[in-house]
Amino acid sequence: MGYERLGPSGATGSVTTSTTTAPILNQVSTSEQPENNNRRSKKKLVVSSIVLAISLILAAAIFAGVRSRLKLNQSVPGLARKPSQAISKACELTRFPELCVDSLMDFPGSLAASSSKDLIHVTVNMTLHHFSHALYSSASLSFVDMPPRARSAYDSCVELLDDSVDALSRALSSVVSSSAKPQDVTTWLSAALTNHDTCTEGFDGVDDGGVKDHMTAALQNLSELVSNCLAIFSASHDGDDFAGVPIQNRRLLGVEEREEKFPRWMRPKEREILEMPVSQIQADIIVSKDGNGTCKTISEAIKKAPQNSTRRIIIYVKAGRYEENNLKVGRKKINLMFVGDGKGKTVISGGKSIFDNITTFHTASFAATGAGFIARDITFENWAGPAKHQAVALRIGADHAVIYRCNIIGYQDTLYVHSNRQFFRECDIYGTVDFIFGNAAVVLQNCSIYARKPMDFQKNTITAQNRKDPNQNTGISIHASRVLAASDLQATNGSTQTYLGRPWKLFSRTVYMMSYIGGHVHTRGWLEWNTTFALDTLYYGEYLNSGPGSGLGQRVSWPGYRVINSTAEANRFTVAEFIYGSSWLPSTGVSFLAGLSI
């Protein structure tokens, strides 16, 4: 199966892509535009340094409060190099206990912590310091000449480390707050771990030893440190959660098992905007190719949008085909809402793939990481084609993101649900291999999922979920949707095998609930990644599905696969419980089913 993505970390016999590594050049990767690259590099270094300084100031301030509260006295002679009972007990619950003990013993404040709840402050603070150091160390490479593939991996890493420092800073602020929400902390820690994985995976196949070796050293143990944070935090809030493979979200009080037109927490004015005809919407920015708007391009509109806005900024993109390649709503562009003229009318398109010597992360035609992102009535497309392998149409890493009434069209790796909490409603998603993939906590509801005709000898796999740690609150929940064959796949008369998903990482988690599954889906339902990898640690579930492909009699018999028979278990993957849709603080909502009922 040479068409596959890179194999899972730590797996033997993993499959690699057929992409050839770019030759090492004695020039910067974007030699066609050296001045732009130098500006970008200098800007990246300055931004990274500023982010690091702010993060360290925040961590120091918060840590000072923790120090005062715990009455730290790290210098007690009898305690030197001997872990406290709290450290020993907490680290026993982690997946990396030796690193847990050693790292905490070397960090101020740990020995004075008397419980796991006290220790979590120190643990997150320590992890934040390590990520901040990695970001600072990485920034020193900004001016180094790199071949294109190494430059893409490096740029991805710097961005992801920056996002992780922000996520860990928010987690640290939250754990010292009396009003902390456990689901927020778990989400941000999960995102930091996912960011690290994406960063390291970007260097797979990179032959630039100097850059790769430097980054490998800078990133050492970061994944394990976040994993330990997740374990200690989970145990400090609910010890029972850690005992099972899936840590499921707790049921929210007051959430009814019925359809709500809009979330209760959504502002009345914004509720109207989501359903309001375009002609009645007062947009802050209008994009029109003919010049009859605020901007002619989407990239210009994104630049014009304010940073860290406390209100919804509406960008209306008029009908037309916008091919600007690698558009991105950055982390500081929060609360942006993109409104188009409808599926197939407003089209955001691109054709980047890994064959352009860039990471999968950078192939996205459109990407959004700013919290509270909403897109409505737009088509996102990557036209690179099946022969170009990984080619993302839409990548979402924004927390509390909503994609409503959109088309997402591609082949391999069409939709990258990268991280944080996401909700898709009434979307049409087209692809072939692993075309819904990533490690967000995401619910797709009332969506149509179309498998297309792949290349010869390829198999279609709808999902490739990459949950790496049992304490991450991530997974893909497909609820009240339709799994269908596109017209080109129908024409093959069943010669192409299509599967519901396969495990990209060890604790991969995907469920299909109350959905229609077409006859093109193989009777086994699910496909191995390779041999027996993750078959006993994954969580794949099916609940009350219908259609000719929903039969359970010949499904796989893996230890991690289950037919869900309990309503309580199925409820764990609903909007209300899996992504806490009814409690999101930013106003980023859409009509949805809170529970299971249709």
UniProtKB/Swiss-Prot annotation:
Domain of life (superkingdom): Eukaryota
Claim: Isomerase is one of the keywords in the record: no
Region annotation Disordered: where it falls in the sequence: 1-40
Involved pathway(s): Glycan metabolism; pectin degradation; 2-dehydro-3-deoxy-D-gluconate from pectin: step 1/5
Compartment annotation: Membrane
Miscellaneous remark of the record: The PMEI region may act as an autoinhibitory domain and prevent untimely PME activity during transport.
Protein name in UniProt: Probable pectinesterase/pectinesterase inhibitor 34
